[in-house]
Amino acid sequence: MGARLKEVYSTEIAPALVKRLQLKNVMEVPRVEKVVLNMGLGEAIQNIKVLESAVEELTRICGQKPVVTKAKKSIAQFKLREGMPIGCMVTLRRDKAYEFLDRLINVALPRVRDFKGVSKKGFDGRGNYTLGIREQLIFPEIDLEKVDKVKGLNVTIVTTAKNDEEGYALMEAIGMPFPKKAQD
């Protein structure tokens, strides 16, 4: 059985986007290529246990083991040397990407305190969308007793859209909770 959001995308969202974006066929419709989750941890320089807990939490959130990212350059002011572990990231593709987006939109984001919608300014000019999450506690997979420190993460949704308008149309159709125009 495939991801629920992927089935909805192929049966309802894609045909609707063909009409909305005035495309010639369904293969031109923008789609989600991958979802990248990144946790940058500056504290990992002093305390390696912070990194271990972040890796464990990211594994629980997306069901895939993250890769530990290392510093590319040495920066003396930050007491950082090249090759030191400073974060972790996961790349989700195909069904796992759609399953994660489904959980993010329908379960995690509604749990954010005082949530009014996600920013429309997260597009990069090429149709990709980046979203910052301030605390990992919004995901139901995280056990609150085991959390030692609140950590944020970045979620980048890479699409096949050619520009921001197509990317916005795709994100809106998938169900990304952008604020309504009256509040702008």
Swiss-Prot record:
Keyword list, A-Z: Ribonucleoprotein, Ribosomal protein, RNA-binding, rRNA-binding, tRNA-binding
GO CC aspect terms: ribonucleoprotein complex; ribosome
Q: Which GO terms describe its molecular function?
A: rRNA binding; structural constituent of ribosome; tRNA binding
Q: One of this protein's Pfam families, by short name?
A: Ribosomal_L5
Q: Which domain of life is it from?
A: Bacteria
Q: Which PROSITE patterns match?
A: RIBOSOMAL_L5 (PS00358)
- The answer on whether this UniProt entry bears the keyword Ribosomal protein reads yes
Coiled-coil stretches: none
Query: Key word Hydrolase present in the record?
Result: no
Family in the record: Belongs to the universal ribosomal protein uL5 family.
Instruction: Give the quaternary structure.
Output: Part of the 50S ribosomal subunit; part of the 5S rRNA/L5/L18/L25 subcomplex. Contacts the 5S rRNA and the P site tRNA. Forms a bridge to the 30S subunit in the 70S ribosome.
Q: What is this protein called?
A: Large ribosomal subunit protein uL5
- Origin species, per record, is Syntrophotalea carbinolica (strain DSM 2380 / NBRC 103641 / GraBd1) (Pelobacter carbinolicus)
Gene that encodes the chain: rplE
